[in-house]
From Swiss-Prot:
Disruption phenotype: Perinatal death with high penetrance due to cranial neural tube defects. Exencephaly is frequently associated by open eyelids. Defects may be due to misregulation of mesenchymal/ectodermal transcription factors. Fetuses also show specific inner ear defects, such as smaller cochleae as well as rotational defects of sensory cells and extra cell rows in the inner ear reminiscent of planar cell polarity (PCP) mutants. Keywords: Bromodomain, Chromatin regulator, Methylation, Nucleus, Phosphoprotein. This is Chromatin remodeling regulator CECR2. The keyword Phosphoprotein applies. Residues 655-664, 887-905, 1352-1364 have a biased composition (Pro residues). The Bromo domain recognizes and binds acetylated histones. Also recognizes and binds histones that are butyrylated. It is found in: Nucleus. Component of the CERF-1 ISWI chromatin remodeling complex (also called the CECR2-containing remodeling factor (CERF) complex) at least composed of CECR2 and SMARCA1. Component of the CERF-5 ISWI chromatin remodeling complex at least composed of CECR2 and SMARCA5/SNF2H. LUZP1 is detected as part of the CERF-1 and CERF-5 complexes in embryonic stem (ES) cells where it is involved in complex stabilization but is not detected in the complexes in the testis. Interacts with CCAR2; CCAR2 may form part of the CERF-1 and/or CEF-5 ISWI chromatin remodeling complexes in ES cells. Residues 1173-1187, 1202-1211 have a biased composition (Low complexity). The gene is Cecr2. It holds the Pfam family Bromodomain. PROSITE patterns: BROMODOMAIN_1, BROMODOMAIN_2.
């Protein structure tokens, strides 16, 4: 019955309404999501048929709760909400009359109620929570489609459960028409659902819209079915079919299925197959399970359909546990299936991404490997070109074939979006370029005839933009290829010389810049390296550091183009040049690379070393450097600009191949004023070696010509034979030396000698900055934790011709003196617990702290004529030292006792170091030369520690600062003792006091003579010594010495030492009075030592630390070569006191032995036992600058200094035309120099200053004989330059020395002095907290040089020692330790060895004479024994105190 008729519909008619199964299907489908009641179609049918108000009201209330998103709608209160939604949606939107205006819902006909229920289901899908609740459901599961169709056009529908409906075709329409109509209608409806059939363009719809479209499709489908039903019922127009229940039991399903078995039509056979295979088995199971369920009673149903869904759930759990379990299981299975599907999809996606990443990584790795291979080939090619050799075929044509990715990789959507955005930006930049107009549109043959015949793949910007808009570029490579094709086409059609081609090149550069900007670069994409000039960035740095370098710097840049930058010269088919050739080919370079250097500046055969340019064009004795070819090709072909902060490579001395003599490479030397008439600058080898197109600021060496700015006093260069420091990486290995991280210490010349692993700021570095060197192509960076960038120290590789024969690497550790008697030191080039591989590097120093002050002002750019003493550091040093120790106030610091050291270092004596001058008329005693030369060195007991001795001798010198970093305790070093400049009035007073103190000094000398057990050594000298020698030279010429010729020794720590001696003298004991220059302060270049100071005494304290290599104490007078604790920060610059000259002299290396069996290895060193450098300024220089001997050569024993060695060992000795000559012709000269020598001792022996102070030359001038001379040899000299800081309390220390006994020392015996630069004796460690100070804080009286040595009045030969010590072939004692460190003994004079440039003084001699100790016999080519010792006056044995047992130093016992 139809609803319009108003009667209750029969059950058959109710089953013919398609809305009923639609409502049941909807509730079943969205039951969980919308919290709808659970029922079957049969139950809904029964409720509608029986007019079950409660069931229908509960269903309506649940649907309205979802529509209004309110939980307070109940079956009792739903009427108002129902009226509201029907009024709004039914009447206003659909335009139908509102049936609820006339009656309530219960009074409406059944048909209308069913329609309202179905419409409420549609409204529920429009609620706001649908999108979130249905996001896990598939759209296909929401759609109901017929199972099939028979030949009559009837459709078979299955919603859910066990029922199947049949829709008969519309009456009056043929089966074909009905079928076609339904098919087209179905296709139209389905096409509205995305993802079903027709693909829709544009953005995918949102979920909510998707659900709405799904529901609307259902509505349309249902409406069509309803219209069919109504048409068949006669209530609607024609063209609609009728619905009826076909089957719901198992028998009915089987009958319907069997009815299609014998059918022959395709549709019916498909329908039969579907029903028989898919539906029939499942439907039978479902019917069987339904039959097993307990019959529900009416009260159960009433409870189930209560308005509150939660209460219904609880009742169901209590009363129907079986149904609840089944329901939960079903839901669980559905959820598991959905989760499993999601997991599978996610896993597959992750696997794809993983494979893509792996492929990309493999491509990148391969690209990087290929790039490294090509780079190595280029470097090898450049190296061969530099050698002038022919290139093998594989190196002739090096292609820059960057790896291209094979195939198109599908990127993620977001990656594609980013790439497309970047491509658009790049394209916009290219289009906006001024030269892009010829490429904007396709080429027209009207103005480009035959273009498309020549160009097969035309391309233009508009075509690329179209492809980009169409999404045809899957990756940027395609985009780049099209752009390159466009540029290639232009070049191909127009030729290289066309204006269009030039515009194409400009546009291509613009394109590359845009690509670099918008596409982040990937490693391995290309191996092209581009070099740009960077003048502006360097300008500020160069001006700040005070250097004047005239050229620009080549640095590496990723930028392929630079509109404002010069492009590097392009060779080899467009590749960027290797660094060496690139620099050489640049036309505006001021200096040429190794390939294009002129003969006097260029390298030999393209090696990385350049010949120094001499103004006089004097031939430099450079060996053929191809003999020094590195072990691996490309060792010197370091990339130009690989480190932008250091554009000149580390200077390396490659070892000669076995069997070839190692010839000394030439190095810049400095001419004295008077020969060259100006201080020219020499370009040192490391600066010319790998500098490429840039002449860097010459930090260590300068051209020996006026600089470009007209400066006649540029920084001083290295002396001949001196090899500047290497700055980058480990040194080159000999050909037979295996490459490993464990480089034995004997093979490496370490760049620094300091104990606490900190950089010393040396003079010849730039101020406060580091100058890192570049590593070569095959060179490894530093092995240890230290930085690869070091300051320019003066530690350099030595010349092999003056060094001991090397020993094989496998015998290094077998040497008895590998470390002191085999006992490693905690500071031996490594912090404790570091492996041997870490010995090579100093610790990282981020920035030079005030603790390690920068180089002196002269090296930072002070021009000639400016005194180093005027530098801010020296002024601050004067102020600080004046505050630390005012004259007359003894300074007795209380320092913690250093812990007892193992091995040969137990006897760290306290640092009371007072130099004693012999109160003997040495100037007129010719015999004093022999006495001073050789003394017995008493035996020393190294096992006699006095750890409990806390009372330090009064004069605690700063040389303890050398040991400070070696000792475990962190006590800060003492402040430098007071230094003051003596006024002329004071000097006169001091002169008078000097005579009165002479006798006391003599007694003290006798007492201390045997205490000093450090062997004599004079391998270095201090500014104080030089100043003293200069004063002595004046005295020697004037002859106005005091009657006894005694000048009290000046102790740098004199204010501290004053308490030791009762004289109460507060004035420096270096008075000139009427004769000498008034006591010049002993800290600067003018710091003078008394003329009577025994040079052997000075040498004595210098060289006891033979076996122990102590980094940092090699250069006793280097600028701040010694680590300083914070208490000495203000005094840092004092260590290398500034003098008037423009630059400190560079120093000669200890040469290699040219004909040694192992030419590639560095020979080990022998600490000097002879005197340090006592200087004698002759009246006129004897040699030209290039003929100067080095300041000192390989260290030797005390008696080795006088021996002439074979000529081939002299790296830069005087020419053969100059006969060997001694420094002194009169021994009284030497006697007057004892004060200087003692002062030299003060540089290194902080602990024995008081001991040496007591040393007195017998007044009668009688030679005490060999025994006393040998004993005198053991007398230690003070080792701290700090002792030059104050001469006030010299008498006090001299007198106190009489009472000083063995117990006064911390460990029982006087500590040895510093050796030639890096070794200790048995009692090597003085107490902590003392610092080596060299240099004077006072302005020198002469502004000729930094440190004007005033050593000896006349260059008269001295007598050789009577008892030379037996040495090995190169003059070294056999027990010497193996310290093949790069700058071992190199920087002894880096603070004080200044060139004499005083004008018109007449007291200057040649360089060798100025810096030559007494007794030196100059051999034309001999450099190993350049500084023989002179005999020193010694006290008789009966004058020596009985309580001190004579001992021999460790290296001579």
């Amino acid at each position: 019955m139809c609803p319009e008729e108003g009667g209750a519909a029969g059950l058959g008619e109710l089953r013919s309404w398609w809305e009923v199964p639609a409502i049941a299907h909807f509730c079943s489908l969205f039951r969980t999501a919308f919290r709808l009641p659970d029922f079957e179609i049969e139950e809904l049918e029964a409720a509608l048929h029986r007019d079950d108000v409660e069931f229908i009201s509960d269903l309506i209330a649940c649907l309205l709760q979802g529509c209004y998103q309110r939980r307070d709608i109940t079956p009792q209160t739903f009427h108002s909400y129902l009226e509201d939604i029907i009024n709004y949606r039914w009447e206003l939107e659909e335009g139908k009359p509102n049936p609820l205006r006339e009656a309530s819902f219960q009074d409406l006909p059944l048909r209308t109620r069913v329609e309202i229920l179905h419409r409420l289901c549609d409204y529920r899908l429009d609620a706001d929570d649908v999108f979130d609740l249905l996001k896990g459901l598939d759209a296909d599961s929401l759609r109901v489609e017929p199972l099939g169709e028979d030949n009559s056009g009837a459709l078979y529908w299955y919603f859910y459960g066990t029922r199947m409906y049949k829709e008969d075709p519309v009456q009056g329409r043929s089966n074909g028409e009905l079928s076609l109509c339904r098919e087209s209608e179905r296709q139209k409806n389905v096409s509205n659902v995305p993802g079903k059939t027709g693909k829709r363009r544009g953005r995918p719809p949102k979920r909510k819209k998707l659900q709405e479209e799904i529901i609307s499709s259902e509505k349309q489908e249902e409406n069509s079915l309803t219209s069919d039903l109504q048409t068949r019922n006669g209530s609607r127009g024609p063209g609609q079919g009728t619905w009826w229940l076909l089957c719901q039991t198992e028998e009915e399903w089987r009958q319907v299925t069997e009815s299609f078995r014998e059918r022959t039509s395709l549709r019916e056979r498909q329908l039969y197959k579907l029903l028989s295979e898919d539906f029939l088995p499942e439907i039978c199971n479902m019917i069987a399970q339904k039959g097993k369920r307990p019959q529900r009673t009416k009260p159960e149903l009433q409870h189930r359909f209560m308005s509150d869904h939660l209460s219904i759930k609880s009742i169901k759990l209590e009363e129907t546990p079986m149904l609840t379990k089944i329901e939960k299981q079903k839901r669980r299975e559905e959820e598991e299936e959905r989760q499993l599907l999601l997991a599978v999809q996610k896993k597959e996606q992750e696997q794809m991404l993983k494979e893509e990443r792996k492929r990309e990584m493999e491509e990148k790795v391969k690209a990087v490997e290929d790039r490294a291979k090509r780079r190595k080939l280029r470097e090898e090619r450049a190296w061969l070109l530099a050698q002038g050799k022919e290139l093998p075929p594989e190196l002739s044509h090096l292609d820059l074939n960057s790896p291209m990715r094979e195939g198109k990789k599908t990127k993620d959507l977001f990656e594609l979006d980013d790439d497309f955005t970047a491509m658009y930006k790049v394209l916009d930049v290219v289009k906006a370029h001024k030269d892009s107009w010829p490429f904007l549109e396709p080429v027209d043959e009207s103005y480009a005839p035959n273009y498309y015949q020549i160009i097969k793949i035309p391309m233009d910007i508009s075509s690329m933009e179209k492809k980009l808009n169409g999404g045809l570029y899957c990756n940027k490579e395609e985009f780049v290829n099209d752009m390159k094709t466009m540029f290639r086409n232009c070049r191909k059609y127009n030729g290289d010389s066309s204006e269009y081609t030039k515009m194409s090149d400009n546009l291509e550069r613009c394109f590359h810049r845009a690509m670099t900007k918008h596409f982040p670069g990937e490693d391995g994409d290309t191996d092209e390296e581009f070099w740009i000039k960077e003048d502006e960035k360097r300008e500020k740095r160069r001006s700040r550091s005070g250097r004047s370098s005239g050229s620009h710097v080549w640095t590496r840049s990723r930028d392929t183009e630079g509109s404002s930058r010069k492009q590097p010269p392009v060779e080899n088919g467009g590749k960027s040049l290797p660094p060496a050739r690139r620099a050489a080919s640049s036309g505006d370079d001021q200096s040429r690379s190794s390939i294009q250097l002129p003969p006097e500046v260029g390298t030999s055969h393209g090696q990385g070393f350049s010949r120094p340019l001499h103004c006089g064009r004097v031939p430099s004795h450079a060996p053929p450097l191809n003999q020094m070819r590195p072990a691996a090709p490309g060792t010197f072909g370091s990339l130009q600009g690989s480190d932008p902060t250091n554009l000149h490579g580390s200077s390396r001395i490659p070892e000669a191949p076995p069997g070839e003599p190692l010839q000394h490479p030439p190095f810049a030397i400095q001419a004295p004023v008077g020969i060259s008439n100006h201080r020219g600058s020499l370009l040192s080898a490391p600066d010319l070696s790998n500098m490429g197109s840039h002449v860097p600021s010459l930090q260590l060496g300068q051209m020996n010509c006026p600089s470009q700015d007209g400066n006649m006093y540029p920084p001083a260069p290295f002396q001949a034979g001196f090899i500047p420091s290497r700055h980058g990486g480990t040194p080159a290995r000999p050909p037979d030396f295996p490459e490993s991280s464990e480089i034995p210490p004997g093979h490496i010349y370490h760049s620094y000698k300091y104990l606490n692993r900190a950089h010393p700021a040396v003079w010849n570095g730039n101020h406060g900055t580091t100058n890192p060197g570049r590593l070569g192509p095959d060179e490894k960076p530093h092995l240890g934790p230290g930085p690869s960038h070091h300051p320019h120290t003066l530690g350099h590789m030595m010349d092999g011709r003056v060094m001991r024969q090397p020993i094989p690497p496998n015998q290094w550790t077998k040497q008895s003196s590998f470390l002191p008697h085999g006992v490693p030191s905690s500071g031996y080039m490594q912090p404790p617990c570091k492996s041997a591989g870490h010995r090579l590097q100093p610790p990282p120093t981020p920035a030079p702290s005030p603790r390690f002050r920068g180089p002196s002002q002269a090296l930072r750019g002070a021009q000639g004529g400016e005194s180093m003493m005027d530098s801010p550091e020296m002024i601050a040093m004067q102020q600080l030292s004046s505050r630390v120790c005012p004259p007359g106030v003894p300074y007795h610091p209380r320092q913690p006792t250093p812990p007892q050291l193992p091995g040969p270092f137990p006897q760290v004596a306290h640092s009371a170091s007072v130099c004693v001058s012999a109160p003997k008329p040495a100037l007129d005693n010719p015999g004093s030369t022999q006495e001073m030369t050789e003394t017995h060195e008493p035996e020393e007991d190294p096992a006699e520690p006095l750890p409990g001795h806390e009372e330090k001798a009064a004069s605690i010198c700063s040389s303890e600062g050398v040991y400070l970093k070696q000792l475990p305790h962190p006590a800060p070093p003492l402040q430098a003792s007071c230094t003051r400049q003596s006024s002329p009035q004071e000097r006169e007073t001091e002169d008078s006091q000097l005579k009165s103190d002479a006798s006391d000094s003599a007694d003290t000398y006798k007492t201390s003579k045997n205490k000093n057990t450090w062997p004599l050594d004079n391998s270095y000298s201090s500014p104080a010594v030089q100043g003293c020698l200069r004063d002595l030279s004046i005295v020697a010429e004037t002859g106005n010495l005091p009657e006894n010729g005694v000048v009290g020794e000046a102790s740098p720590c004199r204010s501290e030492g004053k308490g030791l001696d009762g004289s109460g003298s507060e004035k420096p004991l270096c008075p000139r009075g009427k004769t000498l220059q008034e006591a010049v302060p002993c800290t600067g270049p003018n710091a003078t030592t008394p003329p009577c100071t025994d040079p052997s005494l000075m040498a004595a304290t210098v060289n006891q630390f033979s076996p122990l290599y102590m980094p940092g104490i090699e250069y006793s007078n280097s600028a701040t070569q010694y680590p300083m604790s914070p208490s000495l920060q203000g005094l840092a610059s004092m260590m290398g006191g500034k003098s008037s000259g423009s630059q400190p002299q560079s120093f000669p290396p200890r040469g290699f032995q040219a004909n040694g069996p192992h030419p590639g290895l560095f020979p080990r060193y022998r600490p000097q036992q002879g005197m340090r450098y006592s200087y004698q300024p002759p009246s006129q220089p004897s040699y030209h600058p290039y003929q100067r001997t080095p300041y000192y050569t390989c260290p030797q024993g005390f008696s080795d200094w006088q021996r002439s060695l074979p000529s081939q060992r002299s790296p830069s000795g005087p020419p053969g035309s100059h006969p060997p000559r001694s420094l002194f012709s009169e021994k009284n000269v030497l006697s007057s120099l004892q004060g200087c020598e003692t002062l030299n001792t003060a540089l290194t022996s902080p602990t024995q200053m008081d001991v040496v102070t007591a040393k007195v030359v017998p007044p009668d001038g009688h030679n005490s004989g060999p025994e006393e001379e040998k004993m005198d040899e053991s007398v230690e000299r003070p080792e701290s330059p700090k002792e030059f800081l104050d001469l006030d309390n010299h008498n006090a220390a001299t007198k106190r020395q009489n009472s000083l006994s063995t117990s006064d020392y911390l460990y029982g015996t006087p500590p040895p002095s510093l050796s030639s630069g890096m070794t200790f004796g048995s009692s090597a460690f003085p107490p902590h907290s003392v610092m080596l100070q060299t240099g004077s804080p006072y302005t020198p009286q002469r502004s000729a040089s930094h440190f004007q040595p005033r050593a000896y009045p006349s260059p008269v030969p001295a007598h050789p020692p009577p008892h030379p010590v037996a040495t090995q072939p190169n003059g070294l004692s056999p027990e010497d330790s193996l310290y093949c460190c790069q700058e071992e003994g190199l920087g002894h004079f880096q603070a004080s060895m200044m060139e004499q440039t005083g004008t018109g003084s007449g007291l200057r001699g040649s360089f060798q004479e100025v810096h030559r100790p007494p007794g030196l016999q100059m051999h034309p080519v001999q450099s190993q024994s350049l500084f023989p010792k002179t005999p020193a006056p010694a006290a008789s044995p009966e004058q020596l105190p009985p309580h001190k047992t004579p001992t021999l130093p460790l290296d001579q016992s």
